[in-house]
Design a protein with these regions (language model features):
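Charge-rich amphipathic alpha-helical interaction elements
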Residues: 1-139
Length: 139
């Protein structure tokens, strides 16, 4: 296998790896959007509780308002932790994607350089062959 073929194979592998990383990034972005949406709903529920103090919730009539507000606060903290973790994960994925782009670019540069080197060698060989044939022919 020639050096160019090995570089093409490496480039193809890096491109496939980047595709997988892009899918992973898309999943992380969707997960983060979902968590943010849940947090928004939670904040809206908290505001609703704050706007009607003293009432009991029909679905949670056994709970006092303060207990429910405390539960919402606890869930909010947990959601915030998940959002922070998912944001960190997304940042790592973006860093990996950037590294993969640099590696792919580097491999492509090496492949182009090797291809050019092979073309120059082929041209030199053809010129030498032409010179050799010209020297053989009588004038």
């Amino acid at each position: 296998m020639s050096k160019v073929q090995r570089l093409e194979k490496a480039q193809s592998a890096l491109e496939k790896k980047s595709q997988l990383t892009k899918r992973e990034k898309q999943h992380a972005e969707q997960s983060l959007a979902s968590l943010n949406s849940q947090k928004e709903l939670l904040n809206d529920a908290r505001k609703s509780c704050d706007s009607r103090p003293g009432e009991k919730l029909s679905s949670l009539s056994c709970w006092g308002r303060n207990q429910f507000v405390e539960l919402l606060a606890d869930v909010s903290v947990l959601l915030e932790e998940k959002i922070k973790a998912e944001s960190g994960n997304l940042e790592q994925i973006n860093q990996r994607l950037e590294e993969e782009r640099r590696m792919t670019s580097g491999v492509e540069h090496l492949k182009n350089k090797e291809t050019e080197k092979q073309q120059q060698k082929q041209l030199r060989d053809e010129l030498q062959e032409t010179d050799r044939l010209l020297q053989r022919t009588p004038r």
